[in-house]
């Protein structure tokens, strides 16, 4: 597993944001300027990062709809978020209203392992480094908590995105196994 971290940190320079040398206090992180003057939706916006676990579920559902994800029951989504170890949101503000443009969360045993879930960036804002910055902040929080094994599940079309961040398929060749009710 140490080989993974050597590869991961070899690629650390892809994470460029004004938070690179700071660790964010999750409890106090309601609104942190992440990117100034980003172009999106035909306008220039400031993008903010929040580690506040409160997320408007309808806004999150719209964000997930924008990338074609299957809808999930909002009650279960709320439970999943409430039971997450780390949540992070990206948004911009316009006319005193927040617009959710990115989200990710991680679950953990709080000791050894964490899994990153639900990484999503609105299509109007993809390709500008926001996904990389969001992942960098989630990983930074997990590493601060001394989590050594970070996993995620990725659809085939985004595997290369995660590979560019230093994630690798299991070096031991172990395949994940799943159980679903029939």
From Swiss-Prot:
Enzyme class, spelled out: transferase
Enzyme Commission identifier(s): 2.3.1.-
Molecular function terms from GO: N-acetyltransferase activity
One Pfam family here: Acetyltransf_1
Subcellular localization(s) per the UniProt record: Plastid, Chloroplast
Keywords per UniProt: Acyltransferase, Chloroplast, Plastid, Transferase
Any Gene Ontology CC annotation: chloroplast
Domain N-acetyltransferase: 55-182
PANTHER family found in the cross-reference section: ACYL-COA N-ACYLTRANSFERASE, GCN5-RELATED N-ACETYLTRANSFERASE 2, CHLOROPLASTIC
Family: Belongs to the acetyltransferase family. Ycf52 subfamily.
Name of this protein: Uncharacterized N-acetyltransferase ycf52
